[in-house]
Amino acid sequence: RDAQAEVQMTNAGVQLAGGSALCRHRPQQSIKRLVIRGRGIQLNDESVSSSLGLRPDGVFQIAGCGRSSFTPRQAVLTLESSSSQPRSGGIGTLQFVEEFTPSVYFNPFSGSPGQYPDEFIPNFDAISESVDGYD
């Protein structure tokens, strides 16, 4: 583990939300009780295993996580490249589309191509009011 990198990431606001489960078996009872301890998991917490599914490329795998291909130093560099300052004011339409439109949806609206906002369709032809590849 790279404790220095984990401290830097924690100080930058990286945190795993949620709690951990603790299963206690009491001999006098025949039922196992599941006790949930609700607290956030900080990266520089000594109880955190390096096998957690935290990756700086935005992928967080909850179940069956394998070993990350990122070293702690690479993770810090990747996370530090993004802005840590909160955004103030509004954002433009194009920036909103780039950041918040799911990439799985090619066209998030239904209807004729003339009704789509131009920002959602990279191959929209404003002159013919058609989308390349559609009949």
From Swiss-Prot:
Propiece residue ranges: 1-19
Gene Ontology MF, one: hexon binding
Gene Ontology cellular-component annotations: viral capsid
Organism: Human adenovirus B serotype 3 (HAdV-3)
Pfam family, one: Adeno_PVIII
Site (Cleavage): G19, S20
Record-stated family: Belongs to the adenoviridae pVIII family.
Protein name: Hexon-associated protein
Domain of life: Viruses
InterPro entries in the cross-refs: Adeno_PVIII
